[in-house]
């Protein structure tokens, strides 16, 4: 597995993976509009987005971040791992890469917004605290980098 900066050539495979990941969690599969144009919604704004690619050149995970304007804080966005690839360290590797890039850009606080109802976000509610995040208000967690 390798983690790379988003490339348009993987766009459709990423979208397919995200829809599968949502379906596996029992959510109605729908695509987040920002993922339809990662370049405009992340790179053109000075933010970042990564893909996890397997040995068959398929997308098995993704995630990115967007800086909160005029602060040293950023939000982690769209951290997904293909359902059949979970519990193999892919999400942790993506988060580590995201946080490393944040630090390089002078970001000191990483935040994440959890969806609702909370029961549908049980994996996120367990994942982020294992990586040093703590809830600071309902549905939000943060970590000092």
Task: Annotate each PLM feature.
Residues 1-2:
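Extreme N-terminal starter segment of soluble prokaryotic enzymes
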Residues 86, 111-124, 142-145:
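Conserved beta-strand-loop-alpha-helix junction that forms the acyl-donor binding cleft
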Residues 81, 87-100, 126, 130:
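Conserved acetyl-CoA-binding loop-helix of GNAT-fold acetyltransferases
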Residues 90, 107, 133:
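Short phosphate-binding/catalytic loops that engage adenosine nucleotides
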Residues 95, 102-116:
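Conserved GNAT acetyl-CoA-binding A-motif
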Residues 130, 134, 139-145:
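Terminal substrate-recognition subdomain of acyl/acetyltransferases
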């Amino acid at each position: 597995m390798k983690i790379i900066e988003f490339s348009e050539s993987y766009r459709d495979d990423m979208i397919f993976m995200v829809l599968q990941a949502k379906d596996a969690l029992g959510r109605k599969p729908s695509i987040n509009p920002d993922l339809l144009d990662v370049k405009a919604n992340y790179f053109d704004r000075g933010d970042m987005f990564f893909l996890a690619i397997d040995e068959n050149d398929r997308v098995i995970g993704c995630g990115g971040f967007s800086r909160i304007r005029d602060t040293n804080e950023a939000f982690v966005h769209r951290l997904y791992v293909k359902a059949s690839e979970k519990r193999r360290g892919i999400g942790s590797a993506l988060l580590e890469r995201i946080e490393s890039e944040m630090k390089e850009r002078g970001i000191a606080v990483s935040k994440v917004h959890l969806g609702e109802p909370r029961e549908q976000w049980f994996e996120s509610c367990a994942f982020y605290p294992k990586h040093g995040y703590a809830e600071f208000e309902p549905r939000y967690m943060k970590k000092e980098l």
